[in-house]
């Protein structure tokens, strides 16, 4: 079987498995509006949020994700665990009981994908491994910062729009447009964190709905 046919087959298997899962609901305009003027208190609050998150590099979240490209797509559960630069991401389809695990390191960029027919795939570029195995375009090395809306302004973003609380609302970076549509409220244990994110790159789209955040002390 040719490489192209193998990629198409693997992508189809993953998307079919994920399509059996619960879908991620589309937004109904719950995101905060973009504003031109940010108050000093809002800027200070966002700076404090960023500083707190930088001091807490170990975290996890559970939620739902939908991935699509052109007319192909699927959705499923996602469990993301981050330990400094190292991550473990599990995508699962409860109905079919299929799951896929991506592990990697954002410092080196390397990654390993398990759960596909034909055995694990690994390489020095996790994004390339994922693209070749599934056909998905996902910026996995940027995702740890993106999902927390962390260091957006310092990461070479082409455009950053803020809401009235000083938080990122829309970001354009590396060809992606990321919309932060809803946030979990701050608690005694952690600051506000994104709850619903939509990212687009051409025909590729990733929609994420976080059910629970956990940040280690």
Swiss-Prot record:
It is found in: Cell outer membrane. GO terms for cellular component: cell outer membrane. A lipid is attached at residue 21 (N-palmitoyl cysteine). Residues 1-20 form the signal peptide. Its main location: membrane. A lipid is attached at residue 21 (S-diacylglycerol cysteine). It holds the Pfam family LolB. Gene3D superfamilies: Lipoprotein localisation LolA/LolB/LppX. It comes from the Bacteria. Keywords: Cell outer membrane, Chaperone, Lipoprotein, Membrane, Palmitate, Protein transport, Signal, Transport. One of its GO terms (biological process) is lipoprotein localization to outer membrane. It is a lipid-anchor. Monomer. Plays a critical role in the incorporation of lipoproteins in the outer membrane after they are released by the LolA protein. Belongs to the LolB family. This is Outer-membrane lipoprotein LolB. It comes from Xanthomonas oryzae pv. oryzae (strain KACC10331 / KXO85). The lineage of its organism: Bacteria, Pseudomonadati, Pseudomonadota, Gammaproteobacteria, Lysobacterales. The gene is lolB.
